[in-house]
């Protein structure tokens, strides 16, 4: 059978990873799920005009991630650590084809900026002003 780009050397399977790489992959995936949840909540608040502490925490989390990506010059700053732990595969490449994985950061950044703009441009509803 011919090798595909996804079968490229260096793509470690779960069984091939050491305990530190497995733990890091789990933590990294969990943090990614939290970030995607924050992004979803920002959009929920934009659409419903809701304002609360969870929105503030979600925005702070997304801004933290934006800062980390800025430090990493568009790549996850954990990449070198992940490689040193024996896991050379970027997280997005575990679930997306390589080309889509490369596009994920700019696409998610655009969605996040649009969500934050929507929150800022749509005034809060009266009900959410009392939720603080």
Predicted regions and their residues:
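Short amphipathic, positively biased membrane-proximal segments
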Residues: 1-132
């Amino acid at each position: 059978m011919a090798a595909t780009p996804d079968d490229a050397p260096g793509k470690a399977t779960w069984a091939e990873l050491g305990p530190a790489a497995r733990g890091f992959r789990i933590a990294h995936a969990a943090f990614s799920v939290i970030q995607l949840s924050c992004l979803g909540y920002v959009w929920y608040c934009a659409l419903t005009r809701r304002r609360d502490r969870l929105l503030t925490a979600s925005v702070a989390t997304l801004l933290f991630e934006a800062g980390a990506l800025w430090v990493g010059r568009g790549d996850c700053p954990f990449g070198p650590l992940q490689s040193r732990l024996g896991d050379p595969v970027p997280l997005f490449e575990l679930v997306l084809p390589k080309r889509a994985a490369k596009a994920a950061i700019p696409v998610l950044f655009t969605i996040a900026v649009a969500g934050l703009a929507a929150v800022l441009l749509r005034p809060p509803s009266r009900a959410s002003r009392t939720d603080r």
